[in-house]
UniProtKB/Swiss-Prot annotation:
Reactions that this protein is recorded to catalyse: tRNA(Arg) + L-arginine + ATP = L-arginyl-tRNA(Arg) + AMP + diphosphate
Entry EC no(s): 6.1.1.19
Locations listed in the record: Cytoplasm
Gene: argS
Species this protein is from: Clostridium botulinum (strain 657 / Type Ba4)
GO BP of this protein: arginyl-tRNA aminoacylation
InterPro entries per the UniProt record, alphabetical: aa-tRNA-synth_I_CS (IPR001412), Arg-tRNA-ligase (IPR001278), Arg-tRNA-synth_N (IPR005148), Arg-tRNA-synth_N_sf (IPR036695), ArgRS_core (IPR035684), DALR_anticod-bd (IPR008909), Rossmann-like_a/b/a_fold (IPR014729), tRNAsynth_Ia_anticodon-bd (IPR009080)
Designated name of the protein: Arginine--tRNA ligase
Amino acid sequence: MDYKNLVAERIKENTELEVDLIEKLIEIPPKKEMGDYAFPCFQLAKTFRKAPNLIAEELKEKINKEGFEKVVTVGPYLNFFVDKTILIKDVLEKVLSEKEKYGSSKVGEGKNVVVEYSSPNIAKPFHIGHLFTTAIGNALYKILSFEGYNCIGINHLGDWGTQFGKLISAYRRWVDEEALEKDAIGELLRIYVKFHEEAEKDPELEKEARLNFKRLEEGSEEETELWNRFKDLSLKEFNKVYDMLGIKFDSLAGESFYSDKMDAVVQEIDDKGLLVDSNGAKVVMLDEYNMPPCMIKKSDGATIYATRDLAAAIYRKKTYDFHKCIYVVGTPQALHFKQVFTTLKLMGHDWADDCKHVGFGLVKLANKKLSTRNGDVVFLEDLLNQSVEETLKIINEKNPNLKNKEDVAKKLGIGAVVFTYLKNNRERDIVFDWKEILSFDGETGPYVEYSYARGKSILRKAGELTGEADYSKLSSKEEFELAKLLGGFNDAIMNAIDKLEPAIVTRYVIEVAKAFNKFYNAHGILNAEDNDVKLARVKLVEATCQVIKNALNLLGIDVVEEM
């Protein structure tokens, strides 16, 4: 039963307010002893021509209280206490019947959502900063899909630009083919850095690089072949990381894909009378929006990121007719996206309002002990491997006889890293600390995973229990609080969609794990006082495990059945 909706329906019966508005006004009281839901009566003061506290008193007398333990007033608020037995029964039966679908809905049915995320640069390291966009984007993709949206995940690869002219020059001069086969990204990075060092002494190199890129733009066979090789080698490396994370994309259309679509966009901007000359460059003036001009073409005639993003947005709208187009890109790019979306609006594309920038913070290291292959760049693959190794050490200390411990270490180690990236508000910076990330105490991935594994261990020991559960036997505070939390899973998901914030689901599953451990520590389960209590508690454990598994899956994290 949706108690929030029930509260809204009961209030609607006695007021002229619509259910949707009432649901938006309903609050969760700050203290549990004040009730489960609270409705503020301020909105009714004009209609009833009375003080809100008097309205609350009147409604309390009139309202149908079926399904609620009691309804009380707290000043101008009408507070509802749900019937605990009914809630527990409703929630557990729903979880156990819907299983892996519990928490899902069809709210997004028939709506396409484009999610652009990850988007590393070809021939550059896939470093620890890239996991922020990758983890957030993957979680949003999964969360939105779970609620019925048809998601299109796009890896907008950085595979075009003058840097490829430089890389071609560097490759022809300094590449070590053996090193390239062993560590493609490392070798491409080495020669790219060397190009910049040498170009400071010899400016002719820059001219040569520009000529290389011009040839590439014109489709020259030799330059195109090299560019494709850089791309293939890079994707081979990137896919190692994506495989570790269990991530697949629906499209790899990167910057190069839009190279033949930009002239039409520039022409459209010009036709609308928006293109202005600024010191030889072509820009769209955005003064009235308190923004600097959006550069469309540089003074040398080259297009830049904004032009490509405009072309990409227009292409995606035509191809996918999206309900929303989400860009998971760092917060420093906020101005860039405001300029792009505003330019789209000025071009007459009102759907620009459906384009959303999802920003995120930076990744910092608590210490410098993370080994690096090249200077201060920490490769993501190395980080994930190191996390798996550290986790395996912990397992060998705590449970050396665990079956499949390498597989468990892989799931736990990678999951712990992803969980860390998704734990807090996405715009907050992350301070990376192994001790905290891999801890089995506190608000960490391993703590939630351990709670799940503990529950699964209880279920294995309980075996097959027959008979129908009597949920009235679950009468304690800990049992009610846990069941009530399980009932709030869909609310957490919908809130995450509304705010485009996966951390809401992460925080939710942490709270479920905490509530489960409180219940576990307060009550005997397998040694309960009688079989009826035992069966009801085992069902509560089963439902808890299901919700933890569903929540972690939405975050892109695999569960471990035993540890």
